[in-house]
Amino acid sequence: MKKAVVLLSGGMDSATTLAIARQSGFACYALSIDYGQRHVAELAAAARIGQSLQVSDHQFLKLDLAVLASSVLTDISATVPLHGTSTGIPVTYVPARNTIMLALALAWAEVLGSHDIFIGVTAVDYSGYPDCRRDYIDAFEKMANLATKAGREGMVLTVHAPLIDLPKREIIQCGMELGIDYGLTVSCYQADEAGYACGQCDACHIRRAGFEAADIPDPTCYRNKQIS
């Protein structure tokens, strides 16, 4: 069975991506990164998802990006903006995060003898991140094949981003068909330790709107019980 490294954050998109990789016949090796994010509950979610989808191995790496990559997601003293209050690239952008994570996935893939990496980025219904676009994924894939021993030896590495052109509604529908329990996932930028969501940030808004568009009950646990 072919091996694939799957970046697994603990959110909806990465969980769906893992399920797609598994459905595609890959033995999945999940990689989750503790980069100093304030919503650390997503790492517990990643562990639950990995167990639920029976990954072959699941590695958790600690890499404190707060030292070099300042963002409201890594600075607990900063305020996460409410949905609709940011313009341009949002303050929740973590500099070079996806590049760093893909590089780590690439290193593990080489060790495993894997030629496939999966990442759950999407360019539709997203919050304006520059590293969630198809041209970025294509550029990283080109670099990976230029900069690795496997690439130099003619073993082409592919970076799969199966959700990149899908709106959240279709992502949710796809995941439901694959049997994902989205109640295991955490999307909120300021989820508490128990995984309860704020219901007010961009991530919460996009998630909730996706379930509404898919006409599927939202399994998210919100701190404010009036949000549903």
Swiss-Prot record:
Cofactor(s) it depends on: Zn(2+)
Binding residues annotated for ATP, in chain numbering: L8, S9, G10, G11, M12, D13, S14, A15, T16, T17, L18
GO terms classed as biological process: queuosine biosynthetic process
Catalytic reaction list: 7-carboxy-7-deazaguanine + NH4(+) + ATP = 7-cyano-7-deazaguanine + ADP + phosphate + H2O + H(+)
Cofactor note: Binds 1 zinc ion per subunit.
Family in the record: Belongs to the QueC family.
Full protein name: 7-cyano-7-deazaguanine synthase
Annotated organism of origin: Nitrosomonas europaea (strain ATCC 19718 / CIP 103999 / KCTC 2705 / NBRC 14298)
